[in-house]
Amino acid sequence: MVLLKRWLRVIAIIGLIATILAPTTAQAASKTVSKVPARAAYVMDANSGQVLYQQNADKRYPIASLSKLLTVYLTVKAINEGKLSWDEEVTMPSNLLKLSHSYAYSSLQMKAGEKFTVKQLVAAAMIASSNSAATELGEIVAGNNAKFIALMNQQSEDWGLEAHFISSSGLDNSDLKDFDLVLPDTGKNEQNLVSAKAITKVAQQLLKADPDITKIASQTEASINGTKIFNENSCLPGKSQYKKDSGIDGLKTGYTENAKLCFTATYTVNGQRMVATILGGDTTFSAMNKLIKQLKQKYSLETTPLTAQRIALANGLATTVTATPMASQAGVWYQDKTTSLETKVETKLTPAQLSSGTVNVGDPVAQATVTDTQTGTAQQITYRADQTATLFAERVVFTAKSTTDQLLTALKQPVASLF
Protein backbone atom coordinates (compact mmCIF):
# COMPACT_ATOMS: atom_id res chain seq x y z
CA MET A 1 0.00 0.00 0.00
CA VAL A 2 2.84 2.40 0.90
CA LEU A 3 4.57 1.58 -2.37
CA LEU A 4 1.33 2.22 -4.26
CA LYS A 5 0.91 5.61 -2.59
CA ARG A 6 4.49 6.53 -3.50
CA TRP A 7 3.84 5.60 -7.12
CA LEU A 8 0.62 7.61 -7.13
CA ARG A 9 2.51 10.57 -5.69
CA VAL A 10 5.19 10.28 -8.39
CA ILE A 11 2.52 10.07 -11.08
CA ALA A 12 0.77 13.14 -9.65
CA ILE A 13 4.04 15.10 -9.61
CA ILE A 14 4.80 14.09 -13.18
CA GLY A 15 1.29 15.17 -14.18
CA LEU A 16 1.75 18.51 -12.43
CA ILE A 17 5.10 19.10 -14.16
CA ALA A 18 3.56 18.21 -17.50
CA THR A 19 0.72 20.65 -16.86
CA ILE A 20 3.15 23.45 -15.99
CA LEU A 21 5.38 22.78 -18.99
CA ALA A 22 2.58 22.30 -21.52
CA PRO A 23 1.91 26.02 -22.17
CA THR A 24 5.64 26.67 -22.64
CA THR A 25 5.91 23.87 -25.16
CA ALA A 26 2.83 25.12 -27.03
CA GLN A 27 4.17 28.68 -27.05
CA ALA A 28 7.50 27.56 -28.50
CA ALA A 29 5.73 25.57 -31.20
CA SER A 30 3.52 28.54 -32.09
CA LYS A 31 6.61 30.62 -32.97
CA THR A 32 7.56 28.29 -35.81
CA VAL A 33 6.68 29.46 -39.32
CA SER A 34 5.78 26.54 -41.55
CA LYS A 35 7.02 26.31 -45.10
CA VAL A 36 4.43 27.89 -47.37
CA PRO A 37 2.86 25.32 -49.74
CA ALA A 38 3.79 27.29 -52.84
CA ARG A 39 6.73 28.05 -55.12
CA ALA A 40 7.80 31.21 -53.33
CA ALA A 41 6.83 33.67 -50.60
CA TYR A 42 8.03 36.98 -49.19
CA VAL A 43 6.81 39.19 -46.32
CA MET A 44 8.04 42.66 -45.46
CA ASP A 45 7.21 45.73 -43.42
CA ALA A 46 6.18 48.23 -46.10
CA ASN A 47 7.39 51.19 -44.04
CA SER A 48 10.85 49.96 -43.09
CA GLY A 49 11.52 47.24 -45.65
CA GLN A 50 12.36 44.80 -42.84
CA VAL A 51 11.94 41.22 -44.07
CA LEU A 52 9.96 38.85 -41.85
CA TYR A 53 9.82 35.81 -44.12
CA GLN A 54 11.26 34.62 -47.42
CA GLN A 55 11.09 31.40 -49.40
CA ASN A 56 12.70 31.14 -52.85
CA ALA A 57 12.28 34.91 -52.79
CA ASP A 58 14.78 35.81 -55.53
CA LYS A 59 13.82 33.19 -58.11
CA ARG A 60 11.71 34.39 -61.04
CA TYR A 61 8.32 32.77 -61.54
CA PRO A 62 5.19 33.52 -63.57
CA ILE A 63 3.04 35.97 -61.56
CA ALA A 64 -0.08 36.33 -63.74
CA SER A 65 -2.16 39.40 -62.85
CA LEU A 66 0.14 40.52 -60.04
CA SER A 67 1.85 42.20 -63.00
CA LYS A 68 -0.91 44.82 -62.86
CA LEU A 69 0.65 46.20 -59.66
CA LEU A 70 3.51 47.68 -61.68
CA THR A 71 1.09 48.88 -64.37
CA VAL A 72 -0.97 50.72 -61.76
CA TYR A 73 2.18 52.05 -60.03
CA LEU A 74 3.43 53.62 -63.28
CA THR A 75 -0.04 55.10 -63.85
CA VAL A 76 -0.07 56.64 -60.36
CA LYS A 77 3.48 57.90 -60.89
CA ALA A 78 2.40 59.67 -64.10
CA ILE A 79 -0.53 61.23 -62.23
CA ASN A 80 1.70 62.38 -59.36
CA GLU A 81 4.07 63.96 -61.89
CA GLY A 82 1.23 65.86 -63.54
CA LYS A 83 1.45 63.95 -66.82
CA LEU A 84 -1.99 62.40 -66.40
CA SER A 85 -5.13 62.98 -64.35
CA TRP A 86 -7.54 60.62 -62.62
CA ASP A 87 -10.44 62.21 -64.53
CA GLU A 88 -8.96 61.92 -68.02
CA GLU A 89 -11.36 60.03 -70.29
CA VAL A 90 -10.56 57.47 -72.98
CA THR A 91 -12.36 55.06 -75.28
CA MET A 92 -11.07 51.57 -75.93
CA PRO A 93 -9.33 50.58 -79.19
CA SER A 94 -10.78 47.69 -81.18
CA ASN A 95 -8.28 45.04 -80.05
CA LEU A 96 -8.96 45.81 -76.39
CA LEU A 97 -12.70 45.77 -77.00
CA LYS A 98 -12.22 42.31 -78.48
CA LEU A 99 -10.18 41.29 -75.43
CA SER A 100 -12.91 42.61 -73.12
CA HIS A 101 -15.43 40.29 -74.81
CA SER A 102 -13.20 37.22 -74.58
CA TYR A 103 -14.80 34.62 -72.31
CA ALA A 104 -11.42 33.34 -71.11
CA TYR A 105 -9.67 36.66 -70.45
CA SER A 106 -12.35 39.21 -69.56
CA SER A 107 -13.97 40.35 -66.32
CA LEU A 108 -15.52 43.57 -67.68
CA GLN A 109 -17.15 43.84 -71.09
CA MET A 110 -16.69 47.20 -72.80
CA LYS A 111 -18.61 48.87 -75.62
CA ALA A 112 -17.38 50.76 -78.67
CA GLY A 113 -17.34 54.49 -77.92
CA GLU A 114 -17.84 53.94 -74.20
CA LYS A 115 -15.82 56.40 -72.13
CA PHE A 116 -13.76 55.42 -69.11
CA THR A 117 -11.82 57.65 -66.74
CA VAL A 118 -8.33 56.70 -65.65
CA LYS A 119 -9.71 56.16 -62.15
CA GLN A 120 -12.31 53.72 -63.49
CA LEU A 121 -9.64 51.79 -65.40
CA VAL A 122 -7.48 51.55 -62.28
CA ALA A 123 -10.49 50.26 -60.34
CA ALA A 124 -11.26 47.73 -63.08
CA ALA A 125 -7.64 46.54 -63.07
CA MET A 126 -7.33 46.31 -59.28
CA ILE A 127 -10.78 44.97 -58.37
CA ALA A 128 -11.83 42.87 -61.37
CA SER A 129 -8.34 42.32 -62.79
CA SER A 130 -9.51 43.59 -66.19
CA ASN A 131 -6.84 42.85 -68.78
CA SER A 132 -8.27 45.41 -71.20
CA ALA A 133 -8.20 48.12 -68.51
CA ALA A 134 -4.60 47.37 -67.54
CA THR A 135 -3.41 47.35 -71.15
CA GLU A 136 -5.18 50.64 -71.89
CA LEU A 137 -3.59 52.25 -68.83
CA GLY A 138 -0.19 51.33 -70.22
CA GLU A 139 -1.01 52.81 -73.61
CA ILE A 140 -2.26 56.03 -72.00
CA VAL A 141 0.91 56.40 -69.93
CA ALA A 142 3.51 55.57 -72.59
CA GLY A 143 1.73 56.08 -75.92
CA ASN A 144 1.62 52.45 -76.98
CA ASN A 145 1.91 48.95 -75.57
CA ALA A 146 5.54 48.31 -76.57
CA LYS A 147 6.77 51.56 -75.04
CA PHE A 148 4.96 50.83 -71.81
CA ILE A 149 6.46 47.35 -71.49
CA ALA A 150 9.88 48.95 -72.00
CA LEU A 151 8.99 51.39 -69.21
CA MET A 152 8.03 48.49 -66.93
CA ASN A 153 11.35 46.79 -67.51
CA GLN A 154 13.29 50.03 -67.08
CA GLN A 155 11.57 50.70 -63.76
CA SER A 156 12.35 47.15 -62.64
CA GLU A 157 16.00 47.65 -63.56
CA ASP A 158 16.13 51.00 -61.74
CA TRP A 159 14.86 49.28 -58.58
CA GLY A 160 17.22 46.33 -59.01
CA LEU A 161 14.41 43.79 -59.25
CA GLU A 162 14.54 40.20 -60.44
CA ALA A 163 11.88 40.75 -63.10
CA HIS A 164 11.17 40.69 -66.82
CA PHE A 165 7.88 41.79 -68.39
CA ILE A 166 6.35 41.16 -71.80
CA SER A 167 2.81 42.30 -70.94
CA SER A 168 1.13 44.94 -68.78
CA SER A 169 -1.77 42.66 -67.85
CA GLY A 170 0.04 39.45 -66.91
CA LEU A 171 -1.31 37.43 -69.82
CA ASP A 172 1.17 35.17 -71.63
CA ASN A 173 2.10 35.58 -75.28
CA SER A 174 0.04 32.48 -76.05
CA ASP A 175 -2.97 34.46 -74.75
CA LEU A 176 -2.03 37.81 -76.30
CA LYS A 177 -1.52 36.62 -79.88
CA ASP A 178 -5.20 36.95 -80.80
CA PHE A 179 -5.30 40.61 -79.72
CA ASP A 180 -2.22 42.08 -81.48
CA LEU A 181 -0.40 42.53 -78.17
CA VAL A 182 2.65 40.29 -78.64
CA LEU A 183 5.92 42.22 -78.59
CA PRO A 184 8.36 41.72 -81.49
CA ASP A 185 11.26 39.34 -80.84
CA THR A 186 9.54 37.52 -77.99
CA GLY A 187 8.74 33.80 -77.85
CA LYS A 188 5.29 32.47 -78.63
CA ASN A 189 4.88 31.17 -75.07
CA GLU A 190 6.88 33.88 -73.29
CA GLN A 191 5.45 35.28 -70.06
CA ASN A 192 6.20 37.74 -67.29
CA LEU A 193 8.76 36.26 -64.88
CA VAL A 194 9.14 38.03 -61.55
CA SER A 195 10.41 37.04 -58.11
CA ALA A 196 8.28 37.14 -54.97
CA LYS A 197 10.65 39.70 -53.49
CA ALA A 198 10.41 41.87 -56.60
CA ILE A 199 6.62 42.05 -56.83
CA THR A 200 6.38 42.68 -53.07
CA LYS A 201 8.68 45.66 -53.51
CA VAL A 202 6.52 46.88 -56.40
CA ALA A 203 3.53 46.74 -54.04
CA GLN A 204 5.55 48.65 -51.43
CA GLN A 205 6.28 51.41 -53.95
CA LEU A 206 2.63 51.54 -55.01
CA LEU A 207 1.56 52.01 -51.39
CA LYS A 208 4.06 54.86 -51.04
CA ALA A 209 2.92 56.51 -54.27
CA ASP A 210 -0.77 56.15 -53.38
CA PRO A 211 -1.55 55.04 -49.80
CA ASP A 212 -5.25 55.13 -50.70
CA ILE A 213 -4.89 52.35 -53.28
CA THR A 214 -6.18 49.91 -50.66
CA LYS A 215 -9.48 51.81 -50.61
CA ILE A 216 -9.91 50.58 -54.18
CA ALA A 217 -8.38 47.12 -53.73
CA SER A 218 -10.43 46.34 -50.63
CA GLN A 219 -13.77 46.66 -52.45
CA THR A 220 -15.41 43.28 -52.92
CA GLU A 221 -17.49 44.70 -55.75
CA ALA A 222 -18.03 47.97 -57.59
CA SER A 223 -19.94 49.45 -60.52
CA ILE A 224 -18.34 50.94 -63.63
CA ASN A 225 -20.67 52.68 -66.06
CA GLY A 226 -23.51 50.60 -64.65
CA THR A 227 -21.69 47.28 -64.95
CA LYS A 228 -20.91 45.38 -61.75
CA ILE A 229 -17.40 44.05 -61.22
CA PHE A 230 -16.28 41.62 -58.53
CA ASN A 231 -13.08 41.04 -56.57
CA GLU A 232 -11.49 37.57 -56.57
CA ASN A 233 -9.64 38.25 -53.29
CA SER A 234 -11.29 35.69 -51.00
CA CYS A 235 -9.57 37.12 -47.89
CA LEU A 236 -11.61 40.34 -47.90
CA PRO A 237 -14.49 40.89 -45.43
CA GLY A 238 -17.58 38.92 -46.39
CA LYS A 239 -15.60 36.48 -48.54
CA SER A 240 -15.05 32.77 -47.91
CA GLN A 241 -11.46 33.01 -46.59
CA TYR A 242 -11.86 36.21 -44.58
CA LYS A 243 -10.15 36.13 -41.17
CA LYS A 244 -10.59 39.14 -38.92
CA ASP A 245 -7.25 38.47 -37.23
CA SER A 246 -5.43 38.67 -40.57
CA GLY A 247 -6.89 42.09 -41.38
CA ILE A 248 -6.20 41.79 -45.12
CA ASP A 249 -7.36 44.87 -47.07
CA GLY A 250 -5.82 44.22 -50.49
CA LEU A 251 -4.03 44.04 -52.75
CA LYS A 252 -3.99 41.85 -55.87
CA THR A 253 -4.66 38.29 -56.94
CA GLY A 254 -3.55 36.44 -60.05
CA TYR A 255 -3.98 33.16 -61.84
CA THR A 256 -2.92 31.50 -65.06
CA GLU A 257 -2.34 27.83 -65.71
CA ASN A 258 1.41 28.41 -65.68
CA ALA A 259 1.50 30.79 -62.71
CA LYS A 260 -1.06 28.91 -60.60
CA LEU A 261 -2.56 30.95 -57.75
CA CYS A 262 -0.65 34.11 -56.83
CA PHE A 263 -1.50 36.66 -54.16
CA THR A 264 0.04 39.87 -52.85
CA ALA A 265 -1.72 40.84 -49.62
CA THR A 266 -1.67 44.04 -47.59
CA TYR A 267 -2.54 44.21 -43.91
CA THR A 268 -1.67 46.21 -40.80
CA VAL A 269 -0.18 45.04 -37.50
CA ASN A 270 0.05 47.50 -34.60
CA GLY A 271 -0.03 50.43 -37.00
CA GLN A 272 2.65 49.04 -39.32
CA ARG A 273 1.69 48.44 -42.96
CA MET A 274 2.73 44.98 -44.13
CA VAL A 275 2.98 43.37 -47.58
CA ALA A 276 3.07 39.61 -48.19
CA THR A 277 3.32 37.65 -51.43
CA ILE A 278 2.74 33.98 -52.22
CA LEU A 279 3.47 32.70 -55.73
CA GLY A 280 2.39 29.46 -57.37
CA GLY A 281 0.17 27.81 -54.79
CA ASP A 282 -3.01 25.73 -54.85
CA THR A 283 -4.45 27.04 -51.56
CA THR A 284 -3.03 30.55 -51.58
CA PHE A 285 -5.72 32.31 -49.53
CA SER A 286 -5.71 29.87 -46.61
CA ALA A 287 -1.91 29.71 -46.81
CA MET A 288 -1.74 33.51 -46.55
CA ASN A 289 -3.96 33.55 -43.46
CA LYS A 290 -1.80 30.87 -41.84
CA LEU A 291 1.43 32.69 -42.72
CA ILE A 292 0.18 35.98 -41.26
CA LYS A 293 -1.00 34.23 -38.07
CA GLN A 294 2.34 32.48 -37.55
CA LEU A 295 4.34 35.67 -38.16
CA LYS A 296 2.23 37.52 -35.60
CA GLN A 297 3.06 34.80 -33.08
CA LYS A 298 6.76 34.81 -33.92
CA TYR A 299 7.48 38.55 -34.02
CA SER A 300 6.87 41.44 -31.65
CA LEU A 301 7.02 45.11 -32.57
CA GLU A 302 8.97 47.78 -30.73
CA THR A 303 7.77 51.26 -31.71
CA THR A 304 8.68 54.85 -31.05
CA PRO A 305 6.36 57.80 -31.76
CA LEU A 306 7.29 60.45 -34.32
CA THR A 307 5.91 63.98 -34.05
CA ALA A 308 6.21 67.27 -35.93
CA GLN A 309 9.30 69.29 -35.10
CA ARG A 310 11.44 72.21 -36.17
CA ILE A 311 14.03 71.21 -38.75
CA ALA A 312 17.21 73.26 -39.23
CA LEU A 313 17.64 73.56 -42.99
CA ALA A 314 21.45 73.73 -42.81
CA ASN A 315 24.11 73.27 -40.16
CA GLY A 316 24.73 76.33 -38.04
CA LEU A 317 21.99 78.40 -39.68
CA ALA A 318 19.03 80.06 -38.06
CA THR A 319 16.64 79.07 -40.87
CA THR A 320 14.24 76.39 -39.67
CA VAL A 321 10.93 74.98 -40.82
CA THR A 322 8.20 72.98 -39.11
CA ALA A 323 7.96 69.51 -40.63
CA THR A 324 5.63 66.54 -40.14
CA PRO A 325 6.71 62.88 -40.39
CA MET A 326 5.02 60.71 -43.01
CA ALA A 327 4.21 58.15 -40.31
CA SER A 328 3.12 58.62 -36.70
CA GLN A 329 5.49 55.92 -35.51
CA ALA A 330 8.50 53.89 -36.53
CA GLY A 331 9.02 50.32 -35.50
CA VAL A 332 11.35 47.34 -35.59
CA TRP A 333 10.23 43.71 -35.50
CA TYR A 334 12.07 41.36 -33.15
CA GLN A 335 11.81 37.89 -31.64
CA ASP A 336 12.93 36.41 -28.32
CA LYS A 337 14.66 39.52 -27.02
CA THR A 338 14.16 42.99 -25.64
CA THR A 339 15.13 45.63 -28.15
CA SER A 340 16.27 49.23 -27.75
CA LEU A 341 15.50 51.90 -30.33
CA GLU A 342 17.56 54.98 -31.13
CA THR A 343 16.09 57.84 -33.18
CA LYS A 344 18.12 60.32 -35.21
CA VAL A 345 16.62 63.08 -37.38
CA GLU A 346 18.83 64.57 -40.10
CA THR A 347 18.20 67.38 -42.58
CA LYS A 348 17.95 66.02 -46.15
CA LEU A 349 17.59 68.69 -48.83
CA THR A 350 17.44 67.91 -52.54
CA PRO A 351 19.78 69.47 -55.14
CA ALA A 352 16.76 71.31 -56.57
CA GLN A 353 15.99 72.86 -53.17
CA LEU A 354 19.61 73.93 -52.70
CA SER A 355 19.73 75.36 -56.21
CA SER A 356 16.50 77.36 -55.91
CA GLY A 357 17.06 78.31 -52.29
CA THR A 358 13.41 77.54 -51.53
CA VAL A 359 11.55 74.88 -49.60
CA ASN A 360 7.85 74.55 -50.42
CA VAL A 361 4.99 73.06 -48.41
CA GLY A 362 5.09 69.28 -48.74
CA ASP A 363 8.74 69.13 -49.75
CA PRO A 364 10.89 66.46 -48.05
CA VAL A 365 13.31 68.23 -45.71
CA ALA A 366 14.52 65.62 -43.24
CA GLN A 367 14.75 61.92 -42.52
CA ALA A 368 14.28 60.13 -39.22
CA THR A 369 16.28 56.93 -38.81
CA VAL A 370 15.07 54.63 -36.04
CA THR A 371 17.61 51.90 -35.32
CA ASP A 372 17.50 48.75 -33.22
CA THR A 373 20.77 49.18 -31.33
CA GLN A 374 21.14 45.42 -30.83
CA THR A 375 20.60 44.20 -34.39
CA GLY A 376 21.23 47.28 -36.51
CA THR A 377 17.81 46.94 -38.18
CA ALA A 378 16.59 50.41 -39.11
CA GLN A 379 13.51 52.18 -40.44
CA GLN A 380 13.62 55.54 -42.20
CA ILE A 381 10.73 58.01 -42.21
CA THR A 382 10.62 61.18 -44.31
CA TYR A 383 9.67 64.54 -42.81
CA ARG A 384 7.85 67.01 -45.10
CA ALA A 385 7.72 70.78 -44.66
CA ASP A 386 4.53 72.34 -43.28
CA GLN A 387 5.49 75.80 -44.52
CA THR A 388 7.48 77.60 -47.19
CA ALA A 389 10.99 78.74 -46.29
CA THR A 390 13.85 80.57 -47.96
CA LEU A 391 17.27 79.03 -47.52
CA PHE A 392 19.33 82.04 -48.53
CA ALA A 393 18.73 85.66 -47.57
CA GLU A 394 19.50 88.56 -49.88
CA ARG A 395 23.17 88.89 -50.77
CA VAL A 396 25.18 91.23 -48.55
CA VAL A 397 27.69 93.64 -50.08
CA PHE A 398 30.46 94.79 -47.76
CA THR A 399 32.12 98.20 -48.11
CA ALA A 400 34.66 100.07 -46.10
CA LYS A 401 31.75 101.93 -44.48
CA SER A 402 29.92 98.81 -43.28
CA THR A 403 28.98 99.16 -39.63
CA THR A 404 29.61 96.63 -36.91
CA ASP A 405 25.86 95.95 -36.66
CA GLN A 406 25.69 95.22 -40.40
CA LEU A 407 28.57 92.77 -40.12
CA LEU A 408 27.03 91.01 -37.12
CA THR A 409 23.67 90.72 -38.92
CA ALA A 410 25.34 89.30 -42.00
CA LEU A 411 27.17 86.66 -39.99
CA LYS A 412 23.80 85.26 -38.88
CA GLN A 413 22.83 84.60 -42.50
CA PRO A 414 23.66 81.52 -44.58
CA VAL A 415 27.24 81.54 -45.79
CA ALA A 416 26.13 81.25 -49.43
CA SER A 417 24.39 84.63 -49.19
CA LEU A 418 27.58 86.45 -48.28
CA PHE A 419 29.25 86.06 -51.68
How would you name each of these model-derived features?
Residues 20, 83, 145, 224-225:
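A short hydrophobic/aromatic micro-motif that marks alpha-helical segments and, especially, helix-coil
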Residues 2-28, 419:
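Sec-dependent N-terminal signal peptides of Gram-positive bacterial secreted proteins and lipoproteins
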Residues 4-8, 63, 114, 118, ...:
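Structural motif marking the loop-to-transmembrane transition
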Residues 12, 37, 361-364:
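Residue-level preference for short coil/turn positions at secondary-structure junctions
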Residues 187-419:
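Domain-terminus/edge residues, biased toward the C-terminal soluble/receptor-binding domains
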Residues 26-197, 207:
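Active-site-adjacent loops and short helices of periplasmic peptidoglycan-processing enzymes
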